[in-house]
Design a protein with these regions (language model features):
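Bacterial Sec-dependent N-terminal signal peptides
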Residues: 1-24
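Short, polar/acidic, helix-capping and beta-turn segments at strand->helix junctions
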Residues: 19-179
Length: 179
């Protein structure tokens, strides 16, 4: 009997320990953006026959975005030829800002983000370039800075022979929304 009671108590203790506590009242991505000096831009319109976002159940799918600058132009070029890895990292960071703007446009309040699940980053690079993960870290690092543990995600970072309009990177993502 004593053994069963101890087992029940430990079970309740572990059930009460949620390692991914998403009901943290201090979680405020918009405050984090402000602290980082980031002002979200207007969301860009799709450039072809698709939509920016789709909600299915509690998942939000965000279409690929690129490094769109405030003047309406993109950071363009191939990494290893036209851009350094650091310049491409900054392009991926800017793309992350554009993704966050798209998320906010779709759901209104960034506190509704329960977790970033998946990031897919495509790098426009010369064939001999092999540091794609370091480039896409520009976006991944930003997501963790803004969303904390909720921003940690699975990821693919791949090289491409070309991207639309010769943009430096294109990144899409999937996230989970609070119920």
């Amino acid at each position: 009997m004593k053994h069963k009671l101890i087992t029940v108590l430990f079970s309740l203790l572990f059930l009460g320990c949620n390692t991914q506590n998403t009901s943290d009242s201090s979680f405020d991505p918009e405050l984090r953006l402000k602290e980082l000096g980031i002002v979200l831009p207007e969301t860009s319109s799709p450039v072809a026959n698709y939509v920016n976002t789709v909600v299915s159940g509690n998942l939000l799918y965000v279409s690929g975005k690129g490094p769109l600058k405030s003047d309406g132009t993109y950071i363009e070029g191939k990494v290893g030829k036209d851009l350094t890895p650091e310049e491409a990292y900054q392009a991926a960071r800017l793309t992350g800002i554009n993704l966050i703007a798209t998320i906010k446009s779709a759901i209104g309040d960034l506190r509704k983000v329960k977790r970033i699940i998946r990031v897919t980053g495509m790098v426009n690079a010369v064939p001999e370039f092999s540091e794609h993960p370091k480039v896409i870290n520009g976006c991944s690092d930003l997501l963790v800075q803004v969303f904390g543990e909720r921003g940690r995600h699975t990821r693919a970072a791949v090289g491409m022979g070309s991207l639309p309009s010769n943009i430096a990177v294109e990144i899409d993502l999937i996230l989970e929304l609070e119920d």
